Amino acid sequence: MRPLLTSVGPLLPTLRQATGLSFGGAALLTALPVLMMGLMALAGGWVNRLLSERASVLLSLLAIALGALWRELAPDSVQLLLSAVLGGLGIGVIQAVMPGIIKHHFLKRMALVAGLWSAALMGGGGLGAAVTPWLNRGHDWHSALAWWALPALAALVVWLWASRGLGRLTSPAGRQAGSLFRSPRAWLLGIYFGLINGGYASLIAWLPPYYMQLGWQPQASGVLLALMTLGQVAGALALPALARGHDRRPLLWAALIMQLVGFIGLIGWPLQTPWLWALLAGVGLGGAFPLCLVLALDHLPQPAAAGRLVAFMQGIGFLLAGVAPYISGLLRDYSGGFLLDWQLHTLLVLLLMALTARFHPRSYRQSGGG
């Protein structure tokens, strides 16, 4: 799923030169999929009424594969942006459906399985960042991007076999989507999730160009982004596994502190220990993602209802996060560098640390279950 997003950054200078896109326009290649992820997460309830979870995942993987293949068939700027929309649709549906499946089938190991799911997402992103520059050495840039249809097709075949006994998740109880729009707690979860993932979206879009601006080669900058995603995998596996009880705040604060140190390092000492800043930011982002999913799932006992809350959180969150790389691109066009963006995300992490205090377990029921 994630190579559709992470494969673009290491090729951005070549891509911009070939298509004439500005930094703001190039940012849409990351922003549009994230925005579509948000829209489809909000539409998840409507999708589930039309399709089973099994069919939703199958169609999602097909959309991701076609989005990647589109980049080979029509590699101009407009078609490139449309391919990002199609791939984002696929990613959005599958990310809305999987949390409910996880809670239904793995209730007692929910935090661990959510971490494994998140780690798989992020590991795929790291693969896209590391391998794409090397694919580009033997192929045109658009062919290098199109290669990422193959993992999506492989995942489709595996899911077709593995999901044969999966039934439709239903729950007569729990809030419907309309009431979630009137829930302050659901909005708080969405904003919280969005601010965290805004940092991720900006880093996958602009970390390689930032280091290429500092003199690095595309292959080295791609490896650095892959290192960040390796940190995400480690964080997604380690932090949820450490979860005890129902208070997620200590681990969320730990994840945010690592993000804070990573962004400060990118601002102050980018060339001294770049691998350390990338790893710290990655571990913090990777750990925070599944913890946010579990935090939302904790609010409601019914899997389908909890899945709707997670879908709402992801919908609002990804719509907010999708704006982040575009704002970053505008800041780059305005300032000529990326420091303003890293400074903005540093301030946002401090805000997130303050918001985390709102998520005491006692507040789950007081908030009306979402």
Where are these regions (language model features)?
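Helix-breaking motifs and short loop linkers at transmembrane-helix boundaries and internal kinks
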Residues: G20, S52, L73-V78, L107, ...
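Cytoplasmic helix-loop-helix junction between adjacent transmembrane helices
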Residues: S83-A119
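Helix-loop-helix hairpin linking two adjacent transmembrane segments in secondary transporters
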Residues: P75-Q79, L107-R164, W206
